[in-house]
C-alpha cells in the first residue's frame, strides 16, 4: 500500500502459484477434477516467504494438493498482465491467469472490460466474511476480494503520553501543546506521512470525492485550508519543522525518544515492537477519522482456464487459520472481518483493529504531495 507494505521493506513482487491437483473445495460446489491454478500475487518480498514456508505447505497438507511457486521480483509487468487478461477476453480465449492480486484501481479498470468474476457468498462461501463496505472492495466494484491489509495508525510513548489523542483534531491540539515532540515523514518518501496529509485534506473535502477513478483538478481548491493548517504546525514539529525521509526514520526517532508521537504503518510498528526495536512503552492506536490504509485485493478472470480451482484456493485463503498466518507473519490486517479471527489475535490488535480511510487516487496523491512540498515544507514559519 504505499511507500509500502512495510521494515518490512516496501517493494512489489509477484508470485505464480501452480496448483497441480485439487481434491476438495472449501464451501464451493465440486466441478470435477481440476488440473491446476495459476496465481499472481503482488506484494513485498516477505510475501514470498509467507507463501513458500507457511501458506502453501499448510494448503498442501489440508487438501493433498501439490503446489509450485515461481517468484518474480519487483512486480515487473503488472500492467502487462492486466493487458494480457483483457486481450484474451476480447479474442474469446481463456487465460492462464486464474487469480490475480493487484491494486484495486487496476481491478476497477478491468471491470469495465467484463474480465472479472463477481465473487459472492453464492460462489465462494468465505466471501461472506469480508466486509462489503471495505474501501478497497468498493473501489474495485466488488470484483476484488482483499486477503491482507494495513493502515497507518498513531504511535505514542505511553511513558510521556498518558492519555493519547483519539481524534485527528486532538492530535493537532497535542502537537501545539507539546512543541518539538511530534513529526511525520515527508509524504513524498513514505506512506505514513502521506496518510497524515490525506486525512488533513479530508477535513475539508470528502474522501469519496478523491478516492474514486475520476479526476478533477478543480476540486483541489478545497485543500487550501488543510495546507494552511499543516503549514501552521511547522514551528511545533520536531526540530522546528523536520520531516524525515521514510517510515524507518520516524520509527528511529520514536525509539530514541526524540519524539513522543507520530503516525506509523500498523504492520511496521507491530513488527518493530515484536523485534524489540521499539521500547515497550510505544503503543499503537487508531484515531477517528482513521488514517488511510490499503488492501491487497485478488480477482479471478471470468475466462480463467481453471476458475473453479481459483475460487477454491481463494476461499481457503480466507479461512481463519490461513488469515491468522497472514496477520501474524505480516503484522497486518486480515481480509476477513476481525470478528472471525481468534480471540488472541483480536486482543493483540485491539487498539488498531478498525477500518481505514481510502487513499486518494494516483493523480490526486501526486498533486497532494506536490502541493505539500510547495506550501508546507517549502514555506517559512
Model-based region annotation:
Residues 354-381:
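Conserved C-terminal helix/tail region of periplasmic/extracytoplasmic solute-binding proteins
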Residues 55, 65, 167, 225, ...:
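Short amphipathic alpha-helical coupling segments at ligand-binding clamshell hinges
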Residues 150, 227-233, 277-302:
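Periplasmic-binding protein-like
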Amino acid at each position: 500500500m504505499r511507500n509500502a507494505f512495510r521494515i518490512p521493506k516496501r517493494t512489489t513482487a509477484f508470485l505464480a502459484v501452480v496448483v497441480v491437483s485439487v481434491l476438495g473445495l472449501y464451501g464451493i460446489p465440486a466441478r470435477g477434477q481440476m488440473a491446476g491454478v495459476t496465481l499472481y500475487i503482488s506484494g513485498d518480498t516477505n510475501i514470498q516467504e509467507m507463501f513458500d514456508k507457511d501458506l502453501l505447505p499448510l494448503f498442501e497438507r489440508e487438501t493433498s494438493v501439490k503446489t509450485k511457486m515461481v517468484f518474480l521480483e519487483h512486480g515487473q509487468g503488472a500492467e502487462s498482465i492486466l493487458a494480457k487478461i483483457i486481450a484474451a477476453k476480447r479474442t474469446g480465449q481463456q487465460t492462464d491467469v486464474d487469480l490475480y492480486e493487484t491494486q484495486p484501481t487496476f481491478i476497477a479498470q478491468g471491470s469495465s472490460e467484463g474480465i472479472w468474476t463477481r465473487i459472492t457468498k453464492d460462489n465462494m462461501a468465505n466471501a461472506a466474511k469480508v466486509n462489503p463496505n471495505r474501501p478497497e472492495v468498493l473501489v474495485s466494484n466488488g470484483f476484488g476480494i482483499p486477503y491482507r491489509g494495513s493502515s497507518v495508525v498513531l504511535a505514542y510513548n505511553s511513558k510521556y503520553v498518558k492519555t493519547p489523542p483519539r481524534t485527528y483534531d486532538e492530535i493537532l491540539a497535542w502537537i501545539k501543546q507539546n512543541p518539538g515532540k511530534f513529526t511525520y515523514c515527508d509524504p513524498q518518501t513514505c506512506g505514513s506521512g502521506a496518510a497524515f496529509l490525506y486525512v488533513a485534506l479530508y477535513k475539508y473535502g470528502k474522501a469519496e470525492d478523491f478516492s474514486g477513478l475520476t479526476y478533477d483538478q478543480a476540486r483541489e481548491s478545497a485543500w487550501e485550508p488543510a495546507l494552511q493548517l499543516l503549514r501552521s504546525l511547522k514551528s511545533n514539529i520536531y526540530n522546528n519543522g523536520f520531516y524525515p525521509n521514510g517510515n524507518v526514520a520516524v520509527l528511529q526517532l520514536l525509539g530514541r525518544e526524540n519524539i513522543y508521537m507520530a503516525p506509523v504503518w500498523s504492520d511496521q510498528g507491530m513488527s518493530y515492537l515484536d523485534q524489540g526495536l521499539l521500547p515497550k512503552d510505544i503503543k499503537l492506536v487508531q484515531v477517528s477519522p482513521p488514517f488511510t490504509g490499503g488492501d491487497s485485493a485478488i480477482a479471478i478472470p471470468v475466462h480463467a482456464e481453471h476458475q473453479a480451482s481459483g475460487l477454491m484456493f481463494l476461499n481457503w485463503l480466507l479461512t481463519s487459520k490461513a488469515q491468522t498466518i497472514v496477520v501474524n507473519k505480516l503484522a497486518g490486517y486480515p481480509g476477513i472481518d476481525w470478528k472471525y479471527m481468534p480471540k488472541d489475535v483480536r486482543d493483540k490488535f485491539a487498539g488498531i483493529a478498525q477500518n481505514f480511510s481510502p487513499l486518494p487516487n494516483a493523480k490526486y496523491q501526486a498533486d497532494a504531495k506536490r502541493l505539500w512540498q510547495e506550501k508546507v515544507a517549502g514555506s517559512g514559519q
